[in-house]
């Protein structure tokens, strides 16, 4: 159970690749195990409540913030409740490959895609999906060395390819720590093959357990902007089944969620 502020943020400063002719490629099963372990740093319980604060920075100055409560459960199902005053009454439901957005006073939800933007570079998919193993098939590419805060960290570079229609990205290049499979950074690609954004993952520790405290999203086209998704609270939570029904969204009272 997590209910605390991040203690440490990791920032990527430079990257250098070290290829070794003697390095051993990981097989599909080993890669799958690595991805599942990386998922555990992001979400430990299948059914959880995640309080996510999204901050948009312009030229290193805080520009806007938005708050979301995300209720996730197995089988790729999530309910996102918009908590900021400017978005009050909005809610989004993800059911597998399908996404619905409910606007205040609207009679029915509208279908959307996981790439619909919320704030800055943060999209619906970035908020509602906290795991990779269910949406992507992984492949080992190389063992590389990343230089982070002046320290060299050995990392596995994996290529993830979408295996579900509702996956936010078609392809992800993901770097995991060789020591403990903690996610370090990722390049996120659209179906067109275009690089959509880059992600960096912050590490924090509580009671001896490491977890992903935040995700920083960077856009190479607009380097003056960055979006930070901070996971302020992650707790086990069982939400009533009725909230995972798109037809219930218009009448669902989520003010207390």
Q: Which positions does each model-derived feature cover?
A:
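Mid-chain, structured segments of secreted extracytoplasmic proteins
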Residues: 68-111
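Flexible, processing/modification-adjacent segments and terminal tails
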Residues: 22-46, 53, 62, 96-170, ...
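A short, sequence-level motif marking secondary-structure junctions
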Residues: 70-74, 96-98, 115-119, 202-205, ...
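Sequence/structural signature of outer-membrane beta-barrel proteins
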Residues: 57-59
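N-terminal signal peptide c-region/cleavage motif recognized by signal peptidases
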Residues: 16-20
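Gly/Pro-enriched, hydrophobic low-complexity segments
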Residues: 112, 151-246
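Bacterial N-terminal signal peptides that target proteins for export
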Residues: 1-8
